[in-house]
């Protein structure tokens, strides 16, 4: 694939300022987006496949009342997933941005904090175990399903440490080039859970509590599979947390995790209020229908959730490197992939609505089928909310992500539900279709309000294009992994230096040095088909990032004793470089060089 031409844009306003064109290819971004989308889809199933399968088996084996009991227990599921979900999502975002900014030690600190906090948070959740009966009585209005809710909540809370550690290990394993291990952990957890679901509920007759107990043991099995990564000496991220780094590592982790914490906490709070209102004013059928709607979101996350994982990991790294072109192409590709999936889900379930409702033990009468189909039309907007919330976090617009999630999970959800309850009680609306219209209105108005606020606050829409808000100048281009194309580097650097006022003699030395580095990569790695190069002016230094999708190879450490003519050395680059670093992250070779321009001039 030949590189495409794009106009070079300046650092403000998105207007052309340099007056020339450069070539940037999306080949690496496209291949890595597809790779991590596939891996992320499997790993995301750790959180969402288990509840979906549980609910389906509960409906088939135990009936609609058991589904309602499990639905009321969803608030406890959110508590169980809170530490692991927040840290397995926010942690990779933080380390990706830190690695992009060349802060390796802080990335280790964020990894260490993520693991410790997931474990500690899970153990603290056990403090709620004695109160399961009390909360279940409130949620179920002391009805016939009170005991089922209590038992389900007990085993769910008991699983919290296992869920947290399993999610964190899987999330960081993906970033650390261990995708197969992460997928193996997920397959083990889900496989054990599904088998034990049938054993506990059908043969041991544990009721709805059997589903929660099976999930606990499934996550424990997933941790056993991931233990080799935990004890591996080849991990990129180390258990290192220096005293002087604690505050900054915590700040980076908290910033990246704030929206995920808001998501989970707001779901817990609103879930309690919503389930109470539905139980008191709509009845068991309303709770069951809302639980099925929650499973629609889970099904969507299972099939398309790899996009969210990719935005967190690959997107965070690209933003840290200020590769806005790559970030935009990644999001565009993910949107195309996932909305095709959304369309298939909506069309398929619209046709087979009755069969789907039957699988959850619900009677598919006319009102219920109509309500379910109305809910299906909320899925495109629901997915947009998910994409926006994750993208805002990766580009450090956490306040927008928090705003969106607060509107979606608390403000609009509770406000519109109160209006819905009023319409049912005062205007005598049919309760089931009214619940469906409530779900649709919440998902539709949330992105509208958020995007309007973003436009007013930032004067642009992030998903449509980011602008560099710093004073630093950045230029990226791509070349294919062939020796004859290395000459393109000279032209790109010469134009870059001319447009930024860098003297010609400096540009010549820099061009020759980078040609040496790229030839070294191509000469010792037969699997390189594309190389991305980024030039960044930062505080008087030139930062050069060289990214390739070949096999693991460190061009800074390799010594070829048989290279008598020194065709593949980097001697000039060694003299010019002030600092240099190599990282193998997300299955890409990343070489970062810091060159003092004064040093280049003296050479």
Regions found by a protein language model. Give the residues of each.
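Short alpha-helical transmembrane segments in multi-pass integral membrane proteins
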Residues: 6, 10-40, 95-159, 208-255, ...
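Transmembrane helix-bundle signature of multi-pass secondary active exporters and lipid flippases
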Residues: 40-93, 159-163, 254-317, 342-345, ...
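Small-residue-rich hydrophobic transmembrane alpha-helices
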Residues: 67-125, 166-175, 289-347, 386-396, ...
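Alpha-helical transmembrane segments of multi-pass membrane transporters
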Residues: 129, 181-206, 220-229, 345, ...
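Alpha-helical transmembrane segments of multi-pass membrane transporters/permeases
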Residues: 172-198, 209, 213-216, 307, ...
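Bergerat-fold GHKL ATPase/HATPase_c domain
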Residues: 456-511
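Conserved ATP-binding N-box helix of the HATPase_c
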Residues: 504-529
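Glycine-rich/acidic phosphate-handling loop/turn and adjacent ATP-lid/helix
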Residues: 543-570
């Amino acid at each position: 694939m030949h590189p495409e031409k794009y106009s070079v844009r300046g650092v403000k306003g998105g207007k052309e300022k340099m007056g020339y064109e450069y070539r940037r290819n999306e080949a690496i971004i496209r291949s890595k987006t597809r790779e991590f989308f596939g891996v992320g889809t499997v790993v995301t199933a750790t959180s969402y496949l288990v509840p979906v399968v549980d609910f389906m088996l509960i409906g088939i084996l135990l009936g609609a009342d058991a589904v309602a009991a499990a639905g009321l227990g969803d608030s406890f599921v959110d508590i169980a997933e809170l530490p692991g979900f927040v840290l397995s999502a926010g942690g990779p975002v933080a380390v990706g941005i830190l690695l992009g900014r060349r802060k390796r030690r802080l990335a280790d600190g964020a990894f260490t904090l993520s693991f410790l906090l997931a474990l500690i948070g899970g153990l603290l959740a056990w403090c709620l175990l004695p109160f399961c009966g009390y909360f279940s009585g409130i949620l179920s209005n002391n009805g016939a399903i009170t005991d089922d809710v209590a038992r389900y909540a007990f085993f769910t809370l008991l699983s919290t440490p296992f869920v947290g550690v399993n999610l964190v290990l899987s999330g960081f394993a993906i970033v650390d080039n261990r995708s197969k291990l992460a997928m193996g952990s997920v397959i083990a957890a889900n496989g054990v859970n599904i088998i034990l679901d049938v054993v506990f509920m059908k043969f041991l007759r544990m009721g709805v509590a059997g589903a929660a107990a099976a999930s606990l043991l499934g996550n424990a099995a997933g941790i056993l599979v991931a233990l080799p990564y935990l004890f591996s000496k080849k991990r990129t991220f180390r258990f290192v947390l220096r005293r002087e780094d604690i505050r900054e590592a915590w700040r980076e982790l908290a910033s990246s995790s704030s929206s995920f914490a808001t998501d989970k906490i707001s779901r817990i709070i609103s879930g309690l209020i919503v389930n109470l209102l539905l139980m008191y004013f709509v009845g068991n059928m309303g709770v069951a229908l809302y639980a099925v709607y929650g499973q629609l979101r889970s099904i969507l996350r299972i099939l398309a959730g790899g996009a969210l994982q990719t935005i967190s990991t690959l997107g965070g790294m690209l933003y840290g490197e200020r590769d806005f072109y790559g970030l935009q192409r990644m999001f565009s590709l993910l949107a195309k992939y996932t909305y095709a999936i959304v369309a298939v889900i909506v069309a398929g379930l619209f046709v087979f609505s009755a069969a789907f409702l039957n699988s959850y033990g619900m009677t598919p009468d006319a009102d219920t089928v109509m309500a379910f189909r109305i809910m299906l039309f909320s899925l495109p907007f629901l997915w947009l909310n998910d994409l926006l919330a994750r993208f805002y976090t990766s580009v450090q617009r956490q306040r927008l992500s928090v705003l969106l999630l607060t509107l979606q999970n608390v403000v609009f959800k509770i406000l519109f539900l109160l209006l819905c309850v009023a319409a049912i009680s005062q205007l005598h609306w049919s309760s089931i279709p009214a619940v469906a219209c409530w779900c649709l209105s919440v998902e539709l108005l949330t992105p509208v309000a958020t995007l309007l606020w973003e436009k007013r606050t930032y004067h642009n829409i992030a998903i449509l294009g980011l602008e560099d808000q710093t004073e630093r100048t950045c230029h990226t281009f791509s070349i294919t992994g062939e020796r004859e194309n290395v000459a393109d580097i000279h032209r790109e650097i010469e134009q870059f230096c001319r447009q930024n006022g860098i003297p010609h003699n400096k540009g010549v030395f820099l061009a020759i040095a980078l040609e040496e580095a790229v030839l070294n990569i191509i000469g010792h790695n037969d699997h390189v088909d594309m190389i991305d190069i980024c030039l960044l002016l930062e505080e008087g230094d030139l930062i050069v990032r060289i990214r390739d999708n070949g096999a693991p190879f460190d061009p800074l450490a390799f010594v070829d004793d048989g290279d008598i003519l020194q065709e593949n050395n980097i001697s000039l680059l060694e003299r010019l470089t002030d600092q240099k670093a190599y990282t193998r992250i997300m299955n890409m070779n990343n070489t970062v060089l810091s060159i003092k321009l004064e040093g280049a001039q003296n050479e």
